[in-house]
Design a protein with these regions (language model features):
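Family-specific signature for flavin-dependent thymidylate synthase
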Residues: 1-164
């Protein structure tokens, strides 16, 4: 499995939207890391304007299903239709573990929400590994965003699964 992440929209978009809500003019500039951290922790709506595209190459089909179940994630999954690609067997015979290329468009709020569930020790090991790879790619671009991608026990201060 390979993962790449591209930040599609800049943080300046969120800053300008937040300024608009308090009657200030847009600045059209990148906000400070301190501002990003505060707005992410507060989970204010402008963070939904910061969008990322996650590209998975050779992701197990069933791991992708775990990820696409989250609301506000927009999936683009390589079709398994026999009229769209050459398969070695019929579509009905493909195992759940078959690998597939999958892209997901998400925003900063969605990254926080998915991390709460998919970084949890109760998530499947394979799904945790896939999401940790996403977090690692995010960290290369935006350590502030990556720092807010935590499991539910860290987010809430206790294990909601009563399992930690």
């Amino acid at each position: 499995m390979e993962v790449t992440v591209i930040q599609e929209t800049p943080w300046s978009r969120a800053l300008d939207a937040a300024r608009r809500t308090i009657g200030k003019e847009p600045l059209h500039k990148e906000p400070s890391d301190n501002w990003k951290a505060k707005v992410l922790l507060a989970e204010h709506s402008p963070i939904k304007l910061v969008e990322y595209c996650i590209h998975f190459k050779n992701l197990r089909q069933w791991v992708g299903v775990h990820l696409l179940r989250h609301e506000h994630m927009l999936p683009f999954i390589h079709s398994q239709r026999e009229d769209r690609r050459k398969l070695n067997c019929s579509r009905d015979e493909l195992p759940q573990g078959s690998e597939n290329d999958q892209d997901f468009v998400v925003n900063a709020q969605t990254l926080i929400n998915i991390s709460r569930k998919r970084l949890c020790k109760c998530a499947s090991k394979e799904t945790q590994e896939a999401w940790k790879a996403v977090k690692s790619e995010i960290a290369k671009q935006d350590i502030v965003m990556a720092d807010k991608m935590v499991p539910n026990c860290v987010y809430s201060g206790f294990c909601r699964e009563l399992n930690c």
